[in-house]
UniProtKB/Swiss-Prot annotation:
Residues 6-258 form the Pyruvate carboxyltransferase domain. Its EC number is 4.1.3.39. It comes from Nocardioides sp. (strain ATCC BAA-499 / JS614). Pfam families: DmpG_comm, HMGL-like. The active site is at 18 (proton acceptor). It catalyses: (S)-4-hydroxy-2-oxopentanoate = acetaldehyde + pyruvate. The keyword Mitochondrion does not apply. GO terms for biological process: catabolic process; L-leucine biosynthetic process. InterPro entries: 2-IPM_HCS-like, 4OH_2_O-val_aldolase, Aldolase_TIM, DmpG_comm, DRE_TIM_HOA, PYR_CT. The record marks 14 as: Transition state stabilizer. This is 4-hydroxy-2-oxovalerate aldolase 1. Signal peptide: none annotated. GO terms for molecular function: 2-isopropylmalate synthase activity; 4-hydroxy-2-oxovalerate aldolase activity; manganese ion binding. Substrate binds at residues 14-15, 168, 197, 288.
Length: 339
């Protein structure tokens, strides 16, 4: 790919699951996938918000299984690449192979930004069965550029075709993104692609995605109406508009994406996906975006300020998988007030 040709991956039906508490009907999945496919996106990711086998008490139960969602997507998909997400320790190689049997041809293997070594088995297994594989270094703001690049190099050594700067907390500024993508490019093989996964918590998702492309990223995550955890992901319709103005080459139809965002996705949201006092605090504190709904429930249950709860999550450096700690923090805050 040349410097301005991009690969647009939609995450409405994976990261967007967080925005609806992992509850979406199969007919809605089919409608959204068909619309995305017709609008020209390159890949469509489908899974529980926390990846294959993520449905649980800790992360939140899904309304359907991953397999039901994936089968519904595969039923109507004609052109785009069907993709999924896997977190080692949550999903297994068995689940990966089942997804492949159902038509998934690309997977992102996700770890915390300093734990790339735990992705080795899963990346290797995905390559062995013939999948396109990306490494997904979550909460990328928690590692400086040089350290993050070392982790990306590990994922490349295991066989990843692409490694992402994954701004799970929506905490990265444009300079932060530029520095991390440049650090990747300095150490990765020229054939290894770089991806950007942005969140809107600081209202920088489109800007950060554009900066990433200008610095060397090829794969860009985005979602209809920004449907995703926290304040959402990079809104695909806004990004495509800016991509057109910036001269990036892609195959997406802007108006078709606008229609799908407004007609199919916004009506599903039981809580507006937007920058507000709670989601802005996520980005400011550097907290995993999917903590939002968990923190709001805990704050309501124990009568604490959700912003103070999120700030303490940030101070403690909580990472994905530690959602249960949110209640402990809320109880600590209640105790501090009582004393």
């Amino acid at each position: 790919m040349n410097a301005h040709q991009i690969f647009v991956q939609d995450v409405t039906l994976r990261d967007g699951m967080h925005a609806v508490r992992h509850r979406i009907g199969l007919d809605d999945v089919r409608r959204i996938v068909a619309a995305l496919d017709a609008a020209g996106v390159d890949a469509i990711e489908v899974a529980h918000g926390d990846g294959l086998a993520g449905s649980s008490v800790n992360y939140g139960p899904g309304s359907h299984t991953d397999w039901e969602w994936i089968e519904a997507a595969a039923d109507v998909l004609e052109r785009a690449r069907l993709t999924t997400l896997l977190l080692p320790g949550v999903g297994t190689i068995h689940e990966l192979k089942t997804a492949y049997d159902l038509g998934v041809r690309s997977v992102r293997v996700a770890t915390h930004c300093t734990e790339a070594d735990i992705s080795a088995q899963h990346i290797t297994a995905a390559r062995e069965i013939g999948m396109d594989v990306s490494g997904f270094l979550m909460l990328s703001h928690m590692a400086p550029p040089a350290e993050l690049a070392k982790q990306a190099l590990l994922m490349e050594s295991y066989g990843a075709h692409c490694v992402y700067v994954t701004d799970s907390g929506g905490r990265l500024t444009m300079n932060d993104v530029r520095d991390r993508v440049a650090a990747y490019r300095d150490v990765l093989d020229p054939a290894t692609e770089i991806g950007i996964h942005a969140h809107e918590n600081l209202s920088l998702s489109v800007a950060n995605s554009v900066v990433a492309v200008e610095t060397g990223a090829v794969r860009v995550d985005a979602s209809l109406a920004g449907h995703g955890a926290g304040a959402g992901n990079c809104p695909i319709e806004a990004f495509v508009a800016v991509a057109n103005l910036s001269g990036f080459e892609h195959g997406c139809d802007l108006f078709a994406l606008q229609d799908a965002a407004d007609d199919l996705v916004r009506p599903l949201q039981d809580r507006p996906v937007r920058v507000d006092r709670e989601t802005l605090t996520l980005g400011y504190a550097g907290v995993y975006s999917s903590f939002l709904r968990h923190a709001e429930r805990a704050a309501d249950q124990y009568g604490v300020d959700v912003r103070e709860l999120l700030m303490e999550c940030g101070r403690r450096g909580l990472v994905g998988g530690q959602e249960d700690m949110i209640i402990d923090i809320a109880l600590d805050q209640v105790g501090a007030v009582a004393s």
